[in-house]
A protein has these predicted regions:
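Acidic/His-enriched low-complexity segments
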Residues: 1-257, 261-269, 394-396, 436
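Active-site rim elements
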Residues: 159-166, 244-250, 322-324, 372-379, ...
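Beta/coil-rich, acidic/histidine-enriched accessory regions frequently appended to metallopeptidases
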Residues: 285, 411-455
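Catalytic zinc-binding patch centered on the HExxH motif and its immediate surroundings
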Residues: 248-250, 265-270, 278-291, 301
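Structural recognition of the beta-strand scaffold that forms the well-ordered cores
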Residues: 204, 237-238, 270, 275-278, ...
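Soluble non-cytosolic domains of exported or imported proteins
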Residues: 245-256, 300-301, 305, 324, ...
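Zinc-dependent metallopeptidase catalytic helix centered on the HExxH motif
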Residues: 168, 291-352
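Acidic/His/Gly-enriched intrinsically disordered linker/tail segments
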Residues: 325-395, 406, 412, 439-455
């Protein structure tokens, strides 16, 4: 997507009116320059969706509340192949023009001034589709018969709802989802109600914590909900396809213990609820969708994967990468968190990773802080990212290391941040000069030799 800019800074009264000079610009993501939009900041998305399985169609009314960060005569939303029937801005009909592969350019009846709050309502229909993605993931949403699930990382949310589909613009969400009787719905946050109608049920959810678009989850299926209470009274709900049996007796039974360990290491769990959603197929991946990570029948029996996706609630979901180049802030940290869990539970720990990579390997000859757009999920992002944290942990000592992580999480909670932001926190808290270490481990093409960095 792209967005509207104001007059260029050198414009004066003699120049053309803003309509002529306004330009639509993206957010400048280094990997996905056409994703996301400038000119405004979204505060809230209200998604009202109706699933028609017979037609494999989702009817949607998405209400976006935003603030203009520039004077705007027009602005852009990310919208991929949405069949848009109407758009209003502040209740007045607006012109909407699909442009390129991702953009819906909206021209309101009246220009918006910098600082104005405005409300956009888009009425549309969407069909399931997956986009070309990076490595493991083809982002988008899947319908299998009556059933629906989503996995949007990195830029697939725009296949289901018009949005500023970039992790630097987080917002609160509510969901109202109408499905044929007999189907259930799971979504981020808390279930607020399920109201039966004529052959349908309407489920509503609120997700009051700041959330990136790629972390939205929506599952429609015949679902069983298993409820319990986690540390500090945290609501824990596991939502499991009714055709999937027995998973709650596996490593999933340790969920409260996992939360407890990470609360102790990293600070309080950041959101209103937790639990996983399990769909009835082997997905080949799991994704840390906020408050409700998605698992297939394969990964839900893996304790390390359950731990990894929980860790992402802190690292990735609460503190989100400001650009996709910063993806190691998600994956390296969740990988290191797995090792800290193993250490706490007597199953080894960080030294195991160091032993695995005692000798440099070409597998990790990719800089974690710049893997490239097709390698977001490369082994180096996970393991060399985690080794960077291992070297940091060993360099500053465990107490200082955990203070760095907690400071990072407190400072950027509900926000997005960069690799540079993390390096600054690490140096500030430790008082150490860490640039050479970060340069070697995050940015050098070749994997460093661990022996050169840890005694």
């Amino acid at each position: 997507g792209s967005g509207g800019a104001a007059d260029p800074p050198d414009a004066d009264a003699g120049d053309a009116a803003p309509e002529a000079t306004a330009e639509l610009t993206g957010l400048g993501d280094p990997y996905y320059p056409d994703v996301g939009n400038s000119g405004y900041d979204v505060g809230d998305y209200a998604l009202d969706l109706t699933w028609h399985p017979d037609e494999q169609r989702m009817d949607g009314v998405t209400t976006i509340t935003a603030v203009a960060t520039d004077d705007l005569t027009r602005f852009s939303l990310d919208a991929v192949d949405l069949d848009v029937s109407s758009v209003t801005v502040d209740g007045e009909p607006a012109t909407a023009t699909p442009t390129g592969e991702r953009d819906l350019i909206v021209e309101p009846a009246e220009p918006l001034g910098q600082g104005d709050e405005f409300v956009v309502v888009v009425t549309y229909a969407a069909a399931p589709q997956l986009l070309a993605g990076a490595d493991l993931l083809s982002p988008g949403w899947v319908a299998d018969g009556d059933e629906v699930y989503v996995a949007f990382e990195p830029h697939g949310a725009a296949t289901l709802f018009p949005s500023n589909d970039h992790p630097s613009d987080k917002a609160t969400y509510s969901f109202t989802v109408t499905v044929p009787t007999g189907l259930d719905v799971a979504a981020n946050g808390m279930l607020r109600g399920a109201v039966p109608g004529d052959g349908v049920t309407t489920f509503s959810f609120s997700a009051p914590d700041q959330m990136a678009t790629y972390l939205v989850q929506l599952v429609i299926a015949d679902l069983d909900v298993v409820e319990s209470t986690g540390p500090g009274g945290l609501p824990v709900r596991h939502v499991i396809d009714a055709d999937v049996g027995g998973v709650v007796e596996g490593p999933l039974a340790r969920t409260a213990e996992m939360i407890d360990v990470f609360d102790d290491l990293f600070g309080p769990y950041p959101f209103v609820a937790y639990g996983v959603v399990v769909v009835d197929e082997p997905l080949g991946y799991a994704l840390e969708t906020q408050t409700l990570p998605i698992f297939g029948t394969d990964a839900v029996t893996s304790e390390p994967t359950l731990v990894h996706e929980l860790a992402h609630q802190w690292f990735g979901d609460s503190v989100t990468p400001a650009t996709w180049q910063d993806i190691w802030l998600n994956e390296g940290f969740a990988t290191y968190a797995e090792l800290l869990w193993r250490e706490r539970t007597g199953q080894g720990g960080p030294d195991d990773l160091a032993a695995t990579y005692a000798e440099p390997t070409p597998l990790l000859d990719l800089p974690p802080a710049d893997p490239g757009p097709t390698e977001l999920f490369a082994p180096s992002v996970y393991d060399r990212g985690a080794l960077t944290l291992y070297v940091l942990d060993r360099t500053v000592g465990r107490d200082v290391f955990l203070t760095i992580l907690r400071t990072w999480l407190e400072r950027y909670d509900d926000s997005s941040a960069t690799t540079g932001d993390f390096e600054a926190v690490a140096e500030e808290v430790s008082g150490a000069e860490l640039t050479p270490m970060f340069d070697a481990w995050l940015r050098a093409p070749q994997m460093p030799d661990l022996d050169d960095w840890v005694g």
